[in-house]
Swiss-Prot record:
Positions annotated to bind ATP: L19, R20, G61, K64, T65, T66, R170, Y180, R217
The EC number(s) this enzyme carries: 3.6.4.-
Organism, as annotated: Leptospira borgpetersenii serovar Hardjo-bovis (strain JB197)
A Pfam family hit: AAA_lid_4
Protein name listed in UniProt: Holliday junction branch migration complex subunit RuvB
GO molecular function: ATP binding; ATP hydrolysis activity; four-way junction DNA binding; four-way junction helicase activity
Gene designation per UniProt: ruvB
UniProt-annotated stretches for the region Small ATPAse domain (RuvB-S): 181-251
Amino acid sequence: MAKSHTLNPEEEFEEESGLRPSLLSEFIGQKEVLNNLTVYVQAAKNRKRALDHVLISGPPGLGKTTLAGIVSNELGTRLTITSAPVITKGADLARLLTSVGENEILFIDEIHTLHKKLEEILYPAMENYMIDLVIGEGVTAQMVQIPLKPFTLVGATTRSGLISEPLKSRFGIQLRLDYYNDEEMKEIVLRSSRILGVKIEDDAALEIGKRSRKTPRIANHLLKRIRDFSEVEGNLSVKKGLCLKAFEKMGIDDLGLDGMDRQILGCMIDRYKGGPVGLKAIAVVVGEEEKTIEDTYESFMVRIGLINRTPAGRVATEKAYRQLKRMQDFSENHGQDPTLF
């Protein structure tokens, strides 16, 4: 397996749990992405040249970092992992770029947060494997070109719209990860359970998958918690009934909504009659950062039809009222006869 080097792991990345797939053949779901990536990787191997630069976008927890590791393993090359928020100076980025060896991979997470001045250092690095540095100050300042070894930059982002067009256009390979379906989530849970040594029935794995917000990272977390409940009860295998009891105790409903999701929807319904309401107002009421609400909670609820984004603000849908069993409030907020519901 190719070696991996992580910068500031205590702040930016979870330790490898052994649950991440290490090869393309082990990755479940995202078929179109995998099929295309397999071709790109094989072509780079055949040419014995660096893979073109890769931009991977999509919601959190879908496998962006995992895919970077897989590409590294498939190519048999070293992977250096960092995150854009920890790169604050041009010298930091220059040190990173000059430390990357021939055909190696530099992975930058949250690349949309990279400062525009630092982006400008990346442009010649990505195009010509060269960085331009200014040495000295004032009239004695000189521009020095430092050659780099051919390398692959893999950028990951949850907000591709915030990446400048000049930077985005320099990624020859652009991949978008989407939420997983229930069957894919079930297979991910079954795979993880085998690695963890947890005996689990198919319908239990499906139940965990359905409540994991279509996100593998969450599925693995929930599987471990279900394992805790199962072991404490002395069960030999995980059954659906145990999962249902455990999820009720953890406050996770059949769509995967937790207490914060319900608090956000409740805020919209109780304080703003279902909306429209601005994200900032919601954040103040529930005591959470706007970015966290938008990336972690709202994006999923929009995807499954509980929240609509409109020019005037966020609106709770009829489905949201039904999920919270608050159709009486829906009829009152929308001036409809409650007997119809």
